[in-house]
Amino acid sequence: MISMMETSTTEKKSNTDNSILKKIIIDSWRQRLSPIEWSLKLYNGFYNNNNNNNSNNNNNNNNNNNNNNVDNNEINSIELCEILLDLMNIGQSPSPLLVSYLRYAISIKLIGYNEFFESVYKFSSISRAQHFSVILDILFDVINIINYPSHHQNIFNSDNIENSNNNNNNNNNNNNNNSNNNIGFKVSSLSSSLKRNNSKIISTPIVTLLSSPSPSSSSSSSTSPSSQQPQPPQPQPLSYTSPIKKTVLIKNPDSTDSDEIMKVKEEPIKFKTTTTTTSTTTTTSTTSTTTNEISSSPPTNGNGEETTITTKTEDSNGINGIDSEDHKGENGKASPQMNGVHPGSDGNISHKRKEMDSNTIFDDDDSNGVDQHCSNKKMKHTDTLTQPQPKQIQNPQQQEQQQQQQENIEQNQHGNLHLHQPSQQQQQQQQQTSQPSLTTTTASAVTQTTTTASTINKSTKATTKKNYHKQLLSFTRLATLLFKVIEYYFQEDERINNINKSVNNNNNNNNNNNNNNNNNNNNNYNNNNNDSMDQNSNNPAVKYNSNNNNINNNNNNNNNNNNNNNNNNNNNNNNNNNNNINNILYKNSVKSLEILSIIQNNSTFKTLIYLAKYEFTLSSFKDLVLPFLAIQNSIRDNIVKQNIPSTQLISSQVKGQEFASQQTQLLNPLFQLIKQKYQKLFIDFRRILINKQEILPNHDIGSLVHGSSQSDKQIILSFEIIIDQEINGNHFKSSHTKLAISRGKPNELDTILNLKNNKNNNNNNNNSNGNGNGIDIGSSTDGSNKLSSTNIEEGNNNNNSSTHLNGNDQSQQSLDDEEPKQSQQQQLPPPSPPQQSHQKIQIQKQLQLIRQAKNLENVSDCFFKLLTLKTVKGLSDVEFLLEIVKILFQKLVRCNPNSNEYKKTRLFLLFKIPHFYSLMIDNYGNNNNNNNTNTNNINNNKNKNSKKSNNKNKNNKNNNKKNKNNNNNNNNNNNNNNNNNNNNNNNNNNNNNNNNNNNGESSDKNEINPEGSIGSNNNNDNDNNDETNTNTSSNNNNNNNNSNDNENVTDNNKNNNSNTKNNNNSNNNNNNNNNNNNNNNNNNNNNNNNNNNNNNNNNNNNNNNNNNNNNNNNNNNNKKNKDLNLHGNIIENVLYQINQFPSLYNVEDNIILSLIQILIKKHLVDINLLKSLFPNYHTDIDSIDSEIQSPPSSELSFDNLFDIHSIADIVKIKELIESLLNNSDPNNVSIMKRLFDFIKNHLINSFDYQDKLLNVLFNAKNIDYDSNKLLIAVIMYIFSDPLVIDTIDVHGYTLRLVMILIDVCESYGSSTTATTTEDIDIFKNENDNHDQKHLYFYFTIPFNLLYTLLIILYDVKNNKYNLDLIKSKLSESLNNKNNSRKSKSNNSSNNSINNINNNNNNNNNNNNNNNNNNNNNNNNNNFIQWIYNMIKDTNFSNGNGVNNVSTSFEFQFLKNLFDSDLGEDSIEKFQNFSQREYSSWDIVSKLPNVLYNIFDCYDRNIIQEEKVTQTMQLLFQYIPFSPIIVFDYLSKTKSSFFNVSPSSSTTTTTTTTSTTTTITTTTTNSSAYSTTTTTSASTSLPKSTDGKLLNGKSSNTSTTTTKNNGDTPTITTVITTMSSKNDKPLSLVEACLTNLNENRLLFRLSDYYKSLISEDHLNDLYKLFDPISETINLLLLSPKLQKFNELGYYSNQSTLFNSICLTNLSPPNQLSNMTPANAIRQVIDQFLTKSVSPNLSNLERDIKYIHMRLSNDLCQIVNLVSLEILDIILQSCQIESLYSIRAMELGGYILGGLIGIESLPILLNSIIPSWSEHIQTSLHGQLLSYFCFSSIVNSNALYYIQTDLCIQQSFKKFFLLLNDTMKRILSVAPLNGLITFCLSTITLFIHLNHSSITTYLYNSSSNTQLINQLYEIISKNQSLKKKQKLKQKKQQHNNNNGGEYNIDQDHIEQIQQQQQQYQKQQQQRKDEPNYEKLEEFIKTQYQRNNHSKLKSIFNILSISQLEDLSMSILNLSNFFLAISIFEDKNDLQYCSKLFN
């Protein structure tokens, strides 16, 4: 009850306050009070009423609310402003007195700036131009005083405020005038006057209008008045502090003195600014006060204007705020009405205000009622308003003269208040102490009074959030209002022009009719005269009749002329009225442009509007975008009008007056002004409002990096380093897949949240003003600098357009929805069954988009690095792609065509460049390049249009024949006219056809501005681009809606529809011209004279000439369009420039044609443009086009495997693979192998659809590993080829392949025959158990490929980046499995995660808890632990610490192994034992311990050599993956079994054709282990053509090697050494492996299995084991670099083997004799000074060698490299040395790429702080920041920020260091070097953050915004379902006799309900089969995204630290750079310091 009473009282209080304020304002206006008097009366009256109300409330209520009385007594500034604006809007012009009240209220901060902006937006009518002009003046002054507070000090101060001469006013306001006598107007005088007036008031709230007096004035006031002489007023600055406070005087209850001691309560207004004004504090004697009470108004001239000189000269009415005498009644009394409205009327003003807003056309009173009182006002915008200039500061002499004149005037005006400008010196002092920004604060005398601690500490997060939103909303509404003013002017101008055109057409028709009548009369007169002369020459009556006819004719002519004159006069009057209205609107629009230009030049204002795009996604921001787009449309229309009529008017024979009138109608003065002066304003606002991409700051580093004075090498090096590492490096190419940031596409979210259907849009652009129809912002992100909005889509009848604003952070809805997104989610309608199905369909669509977004997992890291460098260097898209493609072609020219580097570079060029280009198009929203044109359909449309025109000609001819038959008297004349009409129609139809052809070409070649950029938001604004094309502006968006993914075939019908629509538009235009010509001809045909017919012929000829001229002009415009498109289409332009290089002709393969072919098939290029650019490829392009339009049907089958020509073949291959699923028959191995050999050939040899084929292979769904073991074995056999691995590496599928292999090995390796037979009933029979007997067989092939990838090719053990990626992927997979696993398995998996995350040395703890019972429970632990131990190279334990030795794995396994023989029975027993007891992972993880025990027994002479070889043979024979483990163990151990004497060894290489076996041993000193190890080369076996280690019968024809002497040799390496005692056992082991391979006993099949397989299929089955031999060879040869090179074959297989070669290459001898410091200097100097592109592999070799010489000390090598780079920085002069940037990029690559991520903490936290004192110039600071940036980019730091706490802490320390440095710079002294270093580093981090994370990875699967909303929808659906079920149960209970029934009946009904529900669920699953799975998927995605979310680089800091850093940036730079560090713009609402 109390709360209800409180709400009711507050509502009543607000209503009463509003009425009180309105009453006080009206009474003040009637009494003609000055603003100061009005403010006193306002406060007194408002406070008295509130005190009375408060006393009544206190008597009724408790005393708990006493503390809130003062807060409730304050005046609501918004209500006050709204009342003033309402009252100002009454009448023909606003009352100047009310204007002065409003200005004064703003000046004393009674109305805040934010409140004023919002109130003006709500309560101002643009249509009432005279009223709104005054508001614009106030807005201009407000913006000026915020922007330049020191230059605009007296804008709001009411100077020379005169008192009324009326005695009534003097009698009523004596006390007020006495208080105003003192010019200083001290607070004490105010309080005394208030005390005299209101002696019973406890506390009187007033506002301190001016600053407190100076000490001298305060002391003088205390002395006697007689001792004081009147002094001239001294200027005293008034500073409105930040925060600005409204002061309230409160009585101190403790005071007992009669003079009430007042306290001031200060409350901050929401918007804090800094404004300074001046006040004069002087005192006068009592005699002067009494005389001045009767003094008159200030002196005026004859016109009633004041003679005072101010910065803004206005009349007395405008300045003083006093209406003229016409508004007063008799004897000077105020009239009872205020501009026709009684001041005592109710609150109907607001209703009238709403009616005024609805009226868009001026009333007669408004149009004619020019303000008489403001007509003499001299505006500051009076430069004829064509080129308004900003306010200029006057010279010191002029200021002194003005001050002297003002002082002389003020001596005669002591009764008025005068505020003067300070002197120039004081202005300069103020400029030094304060900055023109919103955040600076200055001291003010207002804050001399004390403030209570309670009011100061009220600022909380809620208030700051409200303040933040309030500021953003106020500035967006201000900009919206200003754009609406300009839009309204264009609308009115079009309306007036249309009226004038219609009037002119009517006048012309009337004139033509009158002329025709006159001509008829004259002809009749001539005929009568001729008859009278011939026949009746002597008859006087006839003569009299002829004279009467002449008189009648003359009278008719005179009447017609009089009518024409009257019409012309009426039209002139209307035109004058319209012109007057238009002139006022023009002035208002120019004022709006001036205010917008101030906003645009101020970074703070502009940033507040920019931030509103993230906060106000729909309602408020939509109102700002729509008028801006409407203005751009009108600008475009004016451009069209400016270009078109020049040809028509010149060619046509028009009179001079008509030409001038038409030209004035077409040329808009505001458009000319915008084109001349405000072009950059619209470009900048377009970038802020419409761009999806966030605008990134580009500081001085941009001009440094891509300066014109530098050579091309400085740009090339960084790109070349990254591309070379991508092609030749052995690192995983896609790393950010799991850590992708949560960004949602706006297009995706629209389809979910917009549950209602979008309405069709109208064709008219004017409809976009009300509801936004017809405008699409989604694709307008071209970054064009042109003035015309050529990229704005005009809605057609069949297009559903919606506006998408800023797809980066927050998703947008369509503009048709008026409610914001949150309210729409909360107010979802109750889901009826059709709505639920619609929702589910939307969810399914979104999940399809999520799955399609997974294609971004194949995006390489190099693309993000290149994008970062692109934005930093400021390269355009053409320059960016041209640089990359040029580097790739240069590599192709230098490489050998038979080398692996050439093949991989070619693959990268053909597939990754189109992939990158498609990503650029899709993610930046520029769909203009997706030109999926169909020339055949376009030609069909042309033919249809031509047929229609021919039909029209036939119809015209038939009509003309009918006209001939009807007119028998004038056959000849009519025939001539008809012929002319036919000629006209034929010519016009030809023009139609020509225009259709031209439009078809322009639609194919969409315009993209040359300066436009897809990938970069460049700040290079080209203001000189004034020329725009007219045809392309209407045809440039034909294909904007056709953004297509790489993986899908596009729909070409959309393009055809868009082309036909544009052609129809052109036809309509030409048809209108034809209709006009035909109408003129029909009017002229009504005349029956020969002269008129001749005139018609002339007119028709002129029309023909006009149409021909139009044709020529259209052709010329289309030629210009072609020229523009040459520069606009990015990839076409790049290929054209690349084709000009003559060195490309040396390349054997025509790579340009291959690239063009792939781009065409991916629908990324314009076919017609390519034909014009490459005429040599015209036939090839036509054939490709025809193949795309009519693709051949696929005829592929298992018996017909030839080539892949189309996507249909890819689909057919997918079907063939799916047909092989779930087929375990071993006889199908030949079919599988044949199909995958065919696939293998297409993976090795590139073709057009290679990426599609890989997508099919890696994105196959619903494959069960257990039921498809044979198929997976065949696939992994194909993937084991090194050339296939190269292809997979280029396309970015390697990391995914590794994870698939881990999943396969886990499923195969964790099962045994015992577990499978117990769990699955199918395998109980012996016939079905053959697969389970060969578990090791299926495990071997994927395990072999996994081992090869991880250990050999990608060297995970020595590559930290690959190691960390695998670890993160393993932890991610375990987290996913733990969510779906039971609680028992959860405990075991979590232990393994903890082991990995803790990185503990678990060397001796692997077998501590090994029991026989844990084999079935801890399989996953063994799998993860073995992978981790294998990666970390931990030592293997030998079973020590096991409690029960008899149950350990080693004991049981060795016992069975030693007890078994090589006989059939013993092998069978061992097979059954091992497969029953041990899984594959058990053997893999524990076999090294077994080997250790075997060789340890051999060393102790416990067993003999024969037993060792026997056990090895048994292992090799049945466990096929054991050789990998055995030889890996042999290469790492120190057993005496391998120790040989260090005797000299000789190596010979021979070529043989027979099978020989040689035993080789050699010694190597491995730098990795620093021990002498023994390895053996493989036995010499015959090699097939692909070089694999095969048996004599096997061969593979899919690959070929280089031929020597025309034959394919088989290479055998024979390494002979001195025999020793211990060579024999090793030789026996190798011989055992060789014999097993030769005799096909490497894997022993069971008899039952052999009985199922035929001979041919058995051979194919054995071939699957060929890659195992190669893996063993690589294990044996990889440490032996020399022998590896002598083999030659393996180095030619893949570029991934290059890393193995580089690890053991010997460095040059020069470096071995140098110190490490000199060696590093030598390496860097040689690299920089080489003219040819250097070899990066040699650089890597040299750096690793130097690092090894430093004993792998990380700190030393980082210090040496950094010192060398810093020496280069200090040696660089101000003009930039030639290799300065090149050296920075090289140093960053050495530290980040070669040394690694570990170098960054040393560089950022140690070296840079110590060397910062040496950075003295700005160039040094820029170079140092770029060096840090290059190190971070090359080290993949973005990944480690997510995973490594050490890297996070180092970056956090570095940011805090930058913050402290910037603070110290401000406090101590500015240092140019450190300032530029700090700002450049921050800017580069912003570019790195946006280019690498937010821009491209928001489409990833971890899409939190999308998934959160889907999750909310699903949860609501589930809750609604539960509610419905509860309702049904309640209804059933109510129906069943009040719920009384037996237990048995309840039980039966429950069972029946369950059955019914089960049946319904099954039916729903049939209808919607995947809905429940979709819900589970979304939930898991939701949990995953909440678990791990990617943060930006700056989000390592907390919100407070971020805010502190942004404040430091703001003090050194601008506001825009300060807020750019916030990745999530919602965090800005918690930053109170930034917005205070």
Curated annotation (Swiss-Prot):
GO terms for molecular function: transcription coregulator activity. Residues 260-270 have a biased composition (Basic and acidic residues). Residues 944-964 have a biased composition (Basic residues). Residues 778-787 have a biased composition (Polar residues). Keywords: Activator, Coiled coil, Nucleus, Transcription, Transcription regulation. Residues 212-229, 273-291, 300-311, 387-451, 501-539, 547-580, 754-770, 788-808, 928-943, 965-999, 1017-1118, 1385-1419, 1565-1584, 1594-1608 have a biased composition (Low complexity). One of its GO terms (cellular component) is mediator complex. Its main location: nucleus. The keyword Ion transport does not apply. Residues 51-70, 159-184, 212-451, 501-580, 754-840, 928-1124, 1375-1419, 1565-1608 are annotated as: Disordered. Residues 505-584, 943-977, 1915-1968 form a coiled coil. It is found in: Nucleus. GO terms for biological process: positive regulation of transcription initiation by RNA polymerase II. Belongs to the Mediator complex subunit 24 family. PANTHER family: MEDIATOR OF RNA POLYMERASE II TRANSCRIPTION SUBUNIT 24. Component of the Mediator complex. Component of the Mediator complex, a coactivator involved in the regulated transcription of nearly all RNA polymerase II-dependent genes. Mediator functions as a bridge to convey information from gene-specific regulatory proteins to the basal RNA polymerase II transcription machinery. Mediator is recruited to promoters by direct interactions with regulatory proteins and serves as a scaffold for the assembly of a functional preinitiation complex with RNA polymerase II and the general transcription factors. This is Putative mediator of RNA polymerase II transcription subunit 24. It comes from Dictyostelium discoideum (Social amoeba).
